[in-house]
Amino acid sequence: MKISFDAIGEKYVTFLAGSGAAKGQVCKVSANDTVSGCAAGEAFCGVVAEVRDGCAAVVMGGYAEVPFSDETDPSAGYATLAADGDGGVKSVTSGGRSCLIVHVDAAAKTLGLFL
């Protein structure tokens, strides 16, 4: 039996899509009603699920999958993560946000986590 966390507790919010808002990448609120891509080290508000017609659907809570750029693979459990500047996340010791990592795919460099 395969374990799936897809759609558990997902909370989507629609924003205007600003610069750098791209599907599958972390984002930040950059202006009124608008999300944009994050610079390295910035805290992120969610993960862009879709961009269409100038709007972005953002997963703000629940399960999401994101790329990671740590040289050492993160471990399952709670971790403090921030944007890596390339649409993914990296582990940080200060700043960022706490997330529950439930799956690490070292080969694909992706994390399954709860926001």
Range-by-range predicted roles:
Residues 1-115:
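Surface-exposed, low-hydrophobicity beta-strand/loop segments enriched in small/polar/acidic residues
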